[in-house]
Amino acid sequence: MTDSAAPTAPTHERGAFGHPRGLMTLFNTELWERFSYYGMRAFLILYMTDVARGGLGLETQISGAIYGLYTFGVYALALPGGWIADRVIGQRQAVLIGGIVIALGHFTLAAPLVIPGSDYWSFYLGLMFLVIGTGLLKPNVSAIVGDLYEGDTPERRDAGFSIYYMGINIGAFLGPLVCSYFAEKVDWHLGFSLAGIGMVFGLIFYVRGIPALKGAGELNDEALANRDQGRKQLLYGLIGTAVFIGVMYALVASGTLAMTVVGFAQATGLIVVVVAALYFGGIMAFACRDKVERHRIFVIFLLFIGAAMFWSGFEQAGSSMNIFTRDLTDRVIFGWEVPTGWL
């Protein structure tokens, strides 16, 4: 008699160099998603601050605050995005839905091409779609890569992730070259459109390659058994979020709460710092059983600080460095002006 409940690793058909065929599906999906993300990011703040060529004409400080809130939202929503995938819809569906919402976000940003006068509402609505879509797609596509190598050797898994990250780098390199060029040289909204088209390409590769994923990215038995509970928790979370946003909007609109975009961005940054400090402090004070564990948590905390500083500097490439490059850098080579987003 055999135990039918014993977990078994999914059987994945091998492709190039002995890696699962599903790896190339995720390689192409993430390549085009990063193409769209970094392609749009390369000129986002330029569009916000531009006046002469149909941009939003916002002040640099306000534009920087919006950019900061956008990038914060993209990565912060990876937490609920991963939870929704694990408890309710599965990683495979989360990637598909996230990709569709990302494409919708880029095309919403491009709406002024066909809907004159829609610049402001389409801009904020488009960014909201991008934040939600990326929060669903980004953490879960990486998790599916790990599922493909369940039961495989660590060396092969590491090699698979190296190939996967190569796709990320290719997309991040090509996106600004294409999207930023047409945005700066032709029309800002054409750049948004090209970013959306890139995400559509990624969705096509993903949908066509889903059969190669086999069982990777699907809900496990425990999640399926508790799916109804997960749906209820998700519903409560959405209702709570909607109520919070509605109350905050009413307070700001009525003048009861004086809050600017810059002030909101600064408050968000302060909250993140406080939460991180309380989190690590709580672990060291109440969860660590001995000096060795506290030492290890402290090392993790130092690595956390280093990572935060690195990514804070890295994200300047899409904000302050773009403004510096546009205003204070000679970009003319042999009579041709290099697009700001390329640098």
Task: List the predicted regions and their residue ranges.
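Central cavity-lining transmembrane alpha-helices of secondary-active solute carriers
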Residues: 64-87, 138, 173-175
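Helix-loop boundary and gating motifs at the non-cytosolic
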Residues: 17-71, 302-305, 311-324
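A gly/Pro-rich, aromatic-decorated transmembrane alpha-helix motif that marks the paired
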Residues: 41-42, 80, 170-185
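Intracellular juxtamembrane helix-capping segments at the cytosolic ends
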Residues: 136-151, 318
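Intracellular loop-helix junctions on the cytosolic face of multi-pass helical membrane proteins
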Residues: 1-19, 151-152, 180-322, 326-333, ...
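Cytoplasmic membrane-interface "Motif A"-like loop-to-helix N-cap segments
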Residues: 87-102, 152, 157, 293
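C-terminal ends and interior cores of transmembrane alpha-helices
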Residues: 97-118, 123
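Hydrophobic core of transmembrane alpha-helices in multi-pass small-molecule transporters
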Residues: 31, 105, 118-137, 304-306
